[in-house]
């Protein structure tokens, strides 16, 4: 079981990061709320991981702290919620926001996320509410808004294409992802900024 990786970021392609440690490059799927906080390529990062085995693949999911990973583990225990949907949930809102939505019994907040219908939202609230008693604490307080800059980043067209691809990977349909990015596109914005703004506008 791979539970933690420390190494150098080789590539960042939302929602994937390639981390080199011990001469091995690990491809890690990360929620966008965690991806935003990663340092730039070429710098060191520590990622807490969850190893998931499927019939057709073995995947690593990564998080910035143990609490986020614990929430992911609880989510995939919920009936009808697999790793891909859990990743989409934690990309669309922070752990703190998700906990608050469940505790407020607010299915409307969850329905806005890709792949979440009314029944799934209600099931999440019922199944997750009791589990949160031992989960959330200081590390689930909202983080300060991050200012993302990329002075030497890709062109705006490249950034928009990367943002659309990331949203599709998170469960949005291609046409919907393209529309979401077009609505918030800015000439000098990098892909991470576009993804964050698109997800924020969808809530």
UniProtKB/Swiss-Prot annotation:
Task: Tell me the superkingdom of the source.
Answer: Bacteria
Query: What are the boundaries of the region Flexible linker?
Result: 143-154
Q: Does the keyword Cytoplasm apply?
A: yes
Which biological process, per GO, is one annotated for this protein? DNA repair
Region of interest called Domain I, as start-end residue ranges on this chain? 1-64
Q: Which GO terms describe its molecular function?
A: ATP binding; four-way junction DNA binding; four-way junction helicase activity
Q: Give the matching Gene3D superfamilies.
A: 5' to 3' exonuclease, C-terminal subdomain (1.10.150.20), DNA helicase RuvA subunit, C-terminal domain (1.10.8.10), Nucleic acid-binding proteins (2.40.50.140)
Record's Gene Ontology CC terms? Answer: cytoplasm; Holliday junction helicase complex; Holliday junction resolvase complex
Span list, region Domain III: 155-203
Q: Which UniProt keywords apply?
A: Cytoplasm, DNA damage, DNA recombination, DNA repair, DNA-binding
Family membership: Belongs to the RuvA family.
Q: Which NCBIfam families match?
A: ruvA (TIGR00084)
Q: What is this protein called?
A: Holliday junction branch migration complex subunit RuvA
Its source organism is Enterobacter sp. (strain 638)
């Amino acid at each position: 079981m791979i539970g933690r990786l420390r190494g150098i970021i080789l590539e960042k392609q939302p929602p994937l990061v390639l981390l080199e440690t011990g001469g091995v490059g690990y491809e890690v799927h990360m929620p966008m709320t965690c991806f935003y906080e990663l340092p730039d390529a070429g710098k060191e990062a520590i990622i807490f991981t969850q190893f998931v085995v499927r019939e057709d693949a073995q995947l690593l999911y990564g998080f910035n702290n143990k609490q986020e990973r614990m929430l992911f583990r609880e989510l995939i225990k919920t009936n009808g919620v697999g790793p891909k949907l859990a990743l989409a949930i934690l990309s669309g809102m922070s752990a703190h926001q998700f906990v608050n939505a469940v505790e407020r019994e607010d299915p409307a907040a969850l329905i806005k996320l890709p792949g979440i219908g009314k029944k799934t939202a209600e099931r999440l609230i019922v199944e997750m509410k009791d589990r949160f008693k031992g989960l959330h604490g200081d590390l689930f307080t909202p983080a300060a808004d991050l200012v993302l800059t990329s002075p030497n980043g890709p062109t705006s067209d490249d950034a928009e294409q990367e943002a659309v691809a990331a949203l599709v990977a998170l469960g949005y349909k291609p046409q919907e992802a393209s529309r979401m990015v077009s609505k918030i596109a800015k000439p000098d914005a990098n892909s991470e900024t576009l993804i964050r703004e698109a997800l924020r506008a969808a809530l």
